Amino acid sequence: MVVAPIPYGFGSYPADWLRSLAALRAHPFKLLIPGHGAPQHDRVYLDRLSGLIADIRSQVAPLAAAHLSYDEARKKIDLSRERRLFAGDDPWLGLWFDQYWAEPFVKMAWQEANGIPITQGEG
């Protein structure tokens, strides 16, 4: 659920993920050990990740309502601010943000907004 510094967007369920992050945020933890990344002593990254998911969903929703195809919608999604927030100027983190987060997660958000089932794996 929490991977840092770049989250993985493959096979995600955006609305469920956002609800799960909210539940985790409400839990009175003192230390959060993410699936990848340094231990966290606060909720800063949780808030950043929740904001990222919410922003993508809010950009995708009107495009889905306008019946844009995934390819058409993807061209209209602007993640430049989020990319800077998560990757900074690091070229590797930028590449990982694009490949591991932006491409798969925007597709999952588009599928969710269009009522298309999100499946895990090949079968």
Listing of model-derived features with the role each one plays in the protein:
Residues M1-D55, Q59-P62:
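Metallo-beta-lactamase
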Residues A65-G123:
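C-terminal regulatory/interaction regions
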